[in-house]
């Protein structure tokens, strides 16, 4: 199993996670509603195709022998998704809230979940939940779009399912190349020169202070 360092954006999120440990501050969550009778077998296939083609959703975190946080990519293994039944919008909102406010066990466990649900009418959808260390709000939107595109392709029996594999390892490698390049040294020199004198911090007056000054 190959271990990789966190990228610089991930390190920032990891520090936030440590400060707000045990909370859902880094949980990104969204719901996809399908305005039609849902074929959940096909939806499961579409989700598994997405997971196979996007290794960032197979990232797991661990601590190495020195206690440093590392990441690794779990091999793809087809997943089974249980479908939850909801009676109405209130139950759906409660389910969304429960999922969105539940923190991840960030070391060792999967950093995402996808929860299909069915409404009494036969319509339904799925709730996507991911840790910010592997995704952002834009990613969540792309996840929904890719899964639904694949879902429609399978339903329509398209001969070719347009699914383009992407790898976070490419980004890790590109960041490492930059950090070991002359360009990085040049950029570092520039910014160190810019901040030889640390600028004063800007302060936003509180509402209480503003009210006191105006009275």
Regions found by a protein language model. Give the residues of each.
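Short amphipathic alpha-helices and their capping loops
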Residues: 1-21, 44-90, 95, 110, ...
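Conserved hydrophobic/aromatic beta-strand scaffold that supports enzyme active sites
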Residues: 29-33, 142, 190
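Active-site-proximal acidic secondary-structure segment that organizes catalysis
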Residues: 3-5, 9, 117-169
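Acyl activation and transfer enzymes in specialized metabolism, enriched
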Residues: 35-58, 128-145
């Amino acid at each position: 199993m190959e271990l990789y360092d966190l990228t610089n954006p991930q390190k920032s999120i990891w520090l936030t996670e440590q400060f707000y440990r045990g909370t859902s501050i880094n949980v990104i969550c969204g719901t996809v509603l399908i305005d039609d009778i849902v074929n959940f077998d096909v939806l499961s296939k579409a989700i598994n195709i997405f997971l196979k083609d996007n290794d960032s959703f197979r990232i797991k975190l661990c601590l190495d022998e020195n206690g440093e946080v590392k990441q690794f990519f779990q091999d793809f293994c087809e997943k089974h998704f249980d479908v939850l039944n909801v009676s109405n919008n209130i139950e759906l909102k409660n389910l969304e809230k429960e999922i969105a406010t539940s923190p991840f066990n960030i070391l060792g466990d999967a950093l995402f979940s996808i929860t299909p649900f069915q409404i009494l009418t036969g319509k339904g959808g799925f709730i996507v939940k991911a840790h910010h260390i592997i995704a952002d709000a834009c990613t969540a939107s792309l996840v929904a779009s890719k899964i639904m595109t694949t879902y429609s392709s399978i339903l329509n029996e398209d001969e070719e399912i347009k699914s383009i594999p992407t790898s976070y390892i490419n980004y890790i490698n590109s960041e490492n190349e930059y950090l070991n390049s002359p360009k990085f040294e040049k950029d570092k020199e520039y910014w160190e020169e810019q901040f030889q004198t640390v600028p004063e911090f800007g302060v936003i007056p509180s509402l209480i202070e503003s009210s006191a000054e105006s009275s």
